[in-house]
């Protein structure tokens, strides 16, 4: 549960800020071990999009790749600043109903615009976590698949299972079928 640590707890477990220059240098140092670049992931990396941009620029200057894993809830201006440095993205598409996104504190249209723009210049894969009773209707899933295919029929959609955790213990795991 590292994402839920307070600043004091983070200090106790040794969480530290890593400047862009240090991360880019470490990525390059690990190249002989097979490292190809940096993936910006866990929590939401675009909360600190300037850090991603600054680091990705340095990583790209070193001839390495940048992969962004995001919820796609960022402005197109931010995306435009990042695209020259990002080689691939995995974007969470949490469902295909505006009401579901609103309950999660997001906006489906913002995410759709982000995805639509990203696929024009970047390798994009999408991930949808199927939550029972929330975004698991065949109608919604078919509508989502049609929309994705309308952008590019070759976009990979990863469909993942939900498991009850943290504040969502009130439902069962997604069935494997």
Positions of predicted regions on the chain:
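Structural recognition of alpha->loop->beta junctions
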Residues: 80-96, 145-156, 177
């Amino acid at each position: 549960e590292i994402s839920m640590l307070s600043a004091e707890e983070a200090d106790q477990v040794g969480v530290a800020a890593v400047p862009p220059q240090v991360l880019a240098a470490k990525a390059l140092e690990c190249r002989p071990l097979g490292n190809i670049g940096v993936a910006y992931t866990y929590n939401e990396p675009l909360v600190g999009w300037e850090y991603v941009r600054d680091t990705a620029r340095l990583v790209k200057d070193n001839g390495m790749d940048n992969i962004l894993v995001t919820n796609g809830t960022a402005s197109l201006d931010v995306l435009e600043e990042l695209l020259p440095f990002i080689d691939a993205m995995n974007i969470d598409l949490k469902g295909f109903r505006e009401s579901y996104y609103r309950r999660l504190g997001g906006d489906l249209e913002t995410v759709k615009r982000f995805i639509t723009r990203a696929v024009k210049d970047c390798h994009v894969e999408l991930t949808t976590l199927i939550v029972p009773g929330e975004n698991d209707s065949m109608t919604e899933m078919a509508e989502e698949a049609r929309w994705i295919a309308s952008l590019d029929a070759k976009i990979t959609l990863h469909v993942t299972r939900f498991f009850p955790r943290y504040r969502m213990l009130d439902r069962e795991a997604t069935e494997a079928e």
